[in-house]
Amino acid sequence: MLNPTKSLPLLLLSWWLVGCGTTAITNLTPSRLPRKDNGQYPFAVEWNSRQQSLVKDSIKAYVVVGLDQYPMQRTPMLTNRWETLVPVPADKNIVTYRYKFDYEYLGFANRKLDSKLSKYYQLFILDK
């Protein structure tokens, strides 16, 4: 059995690592949008992470619709928000999508790759 005095630092370290690795993906895309003549719809997302080892300049965001991935760009003034336009065929009324973030983090000897996926969301396209 572990000595409580020796196990306390280990417990604190694991609690600290879990707290520092928290990531939140917030969908900023409305759930309903009017149909657009050009078929391009805006998608936006916010990423917040407390992971200390995260290499912030390495983050790449995507909107994933089916098997297609649409790259997103960071918004100019807010470094934790991304946006893009996604084409939706005129015959579709519902788009099921999720967000994907690829990024690097600092490992013990070098950088390592990781990825996070959001839950699924739906966009309802309303006819005018």
Q: Where does each model-flagged region fall?
A:
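Glycan-association/targeting regions that enable binding to alpha-glucans and other polysaccharides
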Residues: 20-128
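Sec-dependent bacterial lipoprotein signal peptides
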Residues: 1-21
